[in-house]
């Protein structure tokens, strides 16, 4: 049985002795000593690498499972077999099995050279022993020299892989933008902690200095608020803020803190300052990386938005495979699927919303602008991804992105003109400043004046200027009282008229002059008439009910007769 091994020296074929069984569980004991290893394996043939470049080429092909021409000729000369499926006639065919470490390479050798191969988990102990005793098996090779050759070849192979890796720069951009987001969160958390901590000592300072980094620098320079008067803030703050800060420090309502408290606050300020400085360096690094990997995309949407798009897609090549519609909503997948589920309108933009071209567009045109920016961004991404590395480093590499940006800006101005929207960028004031200026507020109309004479209290018996108003109030009260009296009188008249008409059936002329006995007799007669009327109504209802009952009985009898006839 023959064993193929890849080493830093070259390809080596060993002859496995008949005493050493490859399926033996104790095979590793044969390689505990150099003597045992030489007894189990003998060098059958060796093909040395002529140069580092050829070694890198052959080993890269072997790792990919490909069979190079040099390795194919070496195996044909050493093991035998058939070249390109044709049987070899001149050379003697060797009927021995070849052990290969890589299963993919083993399948390629068997298919191309018709050599029986073995590559499974049972060969792991064998190759582990070969690597352990390789110097003694090769014979005459120093272990230090072998290690040096392996190290040099490993470095060359790694450089070769990195050189042709399509994701090598994408990884740097993805990690940089993720770290930038983390640093922003850390700076925000630490800065808020500094403000809350130092606010017990100087609470007014948080309203005067809004910037977090400037706040930390001022706290670091000033220390206790009593030192504000003697501290020079000219390098940190403008003159007006410096004067406001010093005056507020003298009248502060904060509590006193100890030296140990101030020491810890200073340490936290150092953390905020150092992290902010590193964030500036990282931002510059990211900008340079984006200029190198995607100059057109950077010129169109900026380095931060471009880096976030690449990070979300996974790599520049994956981003180049997306259509413009996907680039437009990239980052808004959650809102997209929620809209599809609820059958609502889908989102118009995702991460691309933070591009400056969309930010400067009016709210009415943001959706249309996002669609146009995504279209041009898709073209720029494909140019960056599929162009050569040398062309990306050229000065004119961002020509496509710059030209697309100019077109989009002119298109935005045209859309604003069509919609009748005045752009903020076009407005120029009289003094040459950009943007709309708020008009100065001016008082208009006639303003009233205060009557100071009403403040004087008269010492004599004269009436006050407001006294005549009491007569008008009295007249209003009298009018209200008269209205109430008239209303009560009308209600009483209506009530009396109702009492008279209650007995409308009786003779009113007799009611006025009748006695008690006559009134009693009249009431009894009236009751008797009502009772007779009620009895007559009840008798009429009884006749109706009896007639209805008789009709129902007749219908029931007819139904019974019909049923009997059917039964018969």
Swiss-Prot record:
A molecular function (GO) term = snoRNA binding
Predominant localisation class: nucleus
Pfam (any one): NOP5NT
Where located? Nucleus, Nucleolus
One of its GO biological process terms is: rRNA processing
The segment annotated Disordered runs over 430-568
Q: Give the UniProt keywords, A-Z.
A: Nucleus, Ribonucleoprotein, Ribosome biogenesis, rRNA processing
This protein's GO cellular component annotations are:
box C/D methylation guide snoRNP complex; nucleolus; small-subunit processome
Where along the chain is composition biased (Basic and acidic residues)? Answer: 471-482, 534-544
Ranges for the Nop domain?
293-417
Stretches of the chain forming a coiled coil according to its record: none
Q: Where is the composition biased (Basic residues)?
A: 522-533
Instruction: Give the UniProt family note.
Output: Belongs to the NOP5/NOP56 family.
Q: Give the protein's function.
A: Required for pre-18S rRNA processing. May bind microtubules.
Q: What is the protein's given name?
A: Nucleolar protein 58
Write down the species.
Answer: Cryptococcus neoformans var. neoformans serotype D (strain JEC21 / ATCC MYA-565)
Gene coding for it: NOP58
